[in-house]
């Protein structure tokens, strides 16, 4: 749906964008023809034709000349549509006619806070932590998932060696104490995930400084010890004050450090911005204690600065969210930035019948603004309610978030798979199956994320087994992010290879030279009559093992093999097709 850069076809894309200043809707139709890799006998030809037709709703009021221009534009549009309808008969097309593999983001969150998913308890030996890590990755592979979202910063701490924050107590049992010598858990997560063909997204909590499950004393280098003026106590929590510029700068520095040092595929933040309200014993909501930062802001505010405290809080969060995306892309343009907010939108924008908590008013998260302005590459709203729950109806919320996706980014809703448990109120696996089926049938979301890994690793009520046999029976590639490409981007060249057959039954395809530096996966498609089958392998597996292909499989003779690389943006490179018949 959002992979026009990869498609060799005649496409039309209808977009509608709301002007964020005056609220006027401007409609336009963008027609794009992209004929790429047309000839198999000479270097690929890249040609593109783009035409924009602007339809101005105020044209009639500006006189007949404008109306005549609009009429001519519409006439030309109809002519172009007729041309597009016949473009398939021009004999232009890719060198290979193989269908592209399906695209769907399939992931699970791996929570480290309170030892929810990994490690299973603090103080585990390194060997046991590694074994649990491998078990999670093996589960993801068996389910044909293609990504993991691993929590690397539970509460202003780290599951990796850091000069900015102390080791997390959820690893060793004591904050600031390394879980083992020469052991970098994040580096191992990245290496193992990539070897298994999985993306690894690093999940940060942007403001939380201490969780109620913590038992260890704060380490001397924890932010609350070094810069106590940046951290406030709120109920059982310690929280970085979003109104303190140095607190936001610290979080940004932590994220930038990880992006620079680790080969991650995504930066991910969850729904904890300003904290969820804490209530007193009497049941009243306690105010968040940010008087000092608010008064400091008011003392220096100019005439046009914000007067409302809620608006100021939302702007504090806005600025950090926008800065995380910009900083991430400035360091590594291909690293995706995603947010997983609470699943309900602003009360004044919600569909009729939707009720519940307002993150806009309580967490000061203006998620619709981030989504509509394209500040995030993907949104994973936590749709943690069953389909039949009317006040938080899953399909209605899906349509709501999809309808606000003006920039054509990825929508990967979060699913509450951990509601499947041993209790009497447990969900049944069918609920998750129906939700995934609904997402696919809608055509408006190209992925989903399970909360959390434990439910799938433990195969609660058989949910993992059922998914593997039905909805995840066939693999899928991660959707591409073509909007992240730099101006000098070029598609990866076709794979260099050697092809030879071992008798009449088996052939081999071996790598010739090194894989391109930007290659993440090699996609191989085999064709036997009308049937095509694809698989993807990592560049390291391709270099070390090559690929063996049965010439005759299930009585069908191999006719052609097509290979292409995927780059860091998930975009398919030039194809090479080997024809046997």
Q: What do the PLM-derived regions correspond to, one by one?
A:
Residues 367-368, 372-389, 407-485:
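Substrate-binding cleft of secreted/luminal carbohydrate-active enzymes
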Residues 111-131, 202, 207-257, 261, ...:
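Active-site-adjacent "subsite" loops/lids of carbohydrate-active enzymes
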Residues 158-173, 208-234, 271-302, 349-358:
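Aromatic- and acidic-residue-enriched segments that line the glycan-binding/catalytic groove
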Residues 477-515, 575-581:
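Pro/Thr/Ser/Gly-rich low-complexity, intrinsically disordered linker/stalk tracts
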Residues 131-157:
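Catalytic domains of carbohydrate-active enzymes, especially glycoside hydrolases
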Residues 254, 261, 266, 275-341, ...:
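Active-site neighborhood of glycoside hydrolase catalytic domains
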